[in-house]
Structures are given as C-alpha cells and as structure tokens.
Amino acid sequence: GIPIVQTLKESLTGNRITSLEGILNGTGNYILSEMTSKGVSFAPALAEAQEKGYAEADPTLDIDGFDTAHKLVLLIRLAWGVDYPYTKMPIEGIRNLDKMDIDFAREFGYRIKLLGRARMRDGKLEAGVFPTLVNHTYLLARVGGAYNAVRVEGNAVGSLFLHGLGAGSLPTASAVLGDLISIARQNNKLN
C-alpha cells in the first residue's frame, strides 16, 4: 500500500490538516476502472477482480464501502487525533452502480470513484464514503486499476498526493511488513 500512515504520523506533524480524500480500496477501484474502460457491467468486473485475486470470495467489505470506511477512520485518527467511528458516517458502496451510471458520468466528463472523504469545517469533522463524480482532469479520476491514492490538504504543505498499488498479494504483504517493522522499531525504543 501507499505510505499514508507514516506520512500522517511523521512527515505532516507540523501541519494542520484541513481535509483528506482518497481511493482507499484497490478492489473497488479495479471494478470501477473495468466498468469504465471496458464498458462492462458490475458483475463481470467483480468476477474478474476475484479471478485476479484482488477481491475476496465474499467481497462485501470492499464493494459496500466498509473497508474504505475502516481505513478512513484510521486516517482521521492520525490526521486530527479524533476517534470517529465508522458507524457515525454515511457509507455507500458501489454494488448498485451499473453501466448506465458509468456512461452517464463519462458523457459529462466525469469518472465515478469510491472515495473516502473527511474535512474539518468550522471546528467540526465531516466524513463519509460514497461513489463520487470526479472531473476527468482531476488526479483522482486518473487513478485506475487496483491502485489507491490519497490527497491530503495541510496548512503548511498545501496539497499532497500519494498514489500506489492497493490490491493484491504484493501490496498487502508490503503494507503488513512495513507495519511489522514499524512495531519492531517502536518496541526497540521502549527497551
């Protein structure tokens, strides 16, 4: 996965984060990318994601937005130090999108992306997960396949964009290994 956790924990500690948004689930993005690029409906795109090992046999967490919501909760905790349960946010997945939705968006110059979004507005945190119309010229609209991307807005750094492979065995193994090394380093500091 992309190094967003370490970025928020270490690199952006001198910033006041104002917003973050991103494609936090590579499986969902792969499905939407297939629907957009190949003109297929949801079911064949999901079947292909499963065949390639991007989607689980039971893809509920990915396609209903809950995996994105769980990741967004973690990013909110790191960015604002707030415990924000996913049950508090609106969550809508991509299960009910069809080819007509994709075609309609494209006709008007948009792509549909499953985004997790959070922002601090007037001292109040707003967050949610939903399929979003994204202008085709915007960076997030150009993220295809099983890739993830996160845009973070900070008062000092401005806009920061991180992008990388987000589904499959290698990115998952890389993220787990990175977490284990981070934990081991932290334990060494404590001893």
Question: What residue ranges belong to the model's regions?
Answer:
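Rossmann-like NAD(P)H-binding beta-loop-alpha module
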Residues: G1-A55, G65-D67, L74
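Conserved active-site and cofactor/substrate-binding residues in soluble primary-metabolism enzymes
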Residues: P3, N15, S37-P44, I63-K71, ...
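Solvent-exposed alpha-helices and their adjacent loops that cap or buttress functional pockets
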Residues: E10-R16, G22-L24, K38, R119-D122, ...
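A short glycine-threonine-serine/GTX helix/turn-capping micro-motif
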Residues: T18-L20, E56-I63, L162-A167
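Short helix-capping/linker segments at secondary-structure and domain boundaries
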Residues: K38-S41, A79-Y86, S182-L190
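Substrate-binding/catalytic subdomain of NAD(P)-dependent oxidoreductase enzymes
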Residues: L46-A149
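ATP-dependent carboxylate/acyl-activation modules
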Residues: Y138-N191
